[in-house]
C-alpha cells in the first residue's frame, strides 16, 4: 500500500531575522551622509506586527524604504512580508509610512491557491488548515509539480514558504 506524502504551504516570517534586518537598517541610516541631521525613525512593533518609517520628506522615506527592503533581502526575507497600510503627514512636515507585517495566508488567497491546485488536475488533495494549506498526494512528483505551480502564481500577496515535507 502506497504511503501518502504531504507538505504545508504557509506564510510564516522569522521575526528574529526581521529584527536583525531592522537593526542593520538603523545602523546603515546612522552612518549615511544623506541622513545626517535629519529626523529618521524606524520602529518595529512585534506584538502589533507593524513597521513604522518616519522621515522629513518623501524622498527620504523612499530611500529609507529601499534600505529596509535591501536588508530584508540580504537576511533571506521576502519583501512581500510588508504590506503598506498608509502614508500620512505628521507634525513639522514629516512623513510617516505604516507597514503591516504579513505572516499568514488570508482566507481568500488560500481559496485562490486551492482552486488553482484543483484546476491543475493533479492527483493531490489541498486542504486549508487555519493559516496553512496542506497538500497531500501519493507521488512526490505531483507534490513537486504543485510547488512549481504555486511559485508561478504571481498575483499572490503573501510570501509563501513550503515546509513540513513528509
UniProtKB/Swiss-Prot annotation:
Gene3D superfamilies: 3.30.70.860, YajQ-like, domain 2. It comes from the Bacteria. InterPro entries: DUF520, UPF0234-like_C, UPF0234_N, YajQ-like_sf. GO terms for molecular function: nucleotide binding. The keyword Nuclease does not apply. Keywords: Nucleotide-binding. It holds the Pfam family DUF520. GO terms for cellular component: cytosol. Nucleotide-binding protein. Belongs to the YajQ family. This is Nucleotide-binding protein SUN_0226. It comes from Sulfurovum sp. (strain NBC37-1).
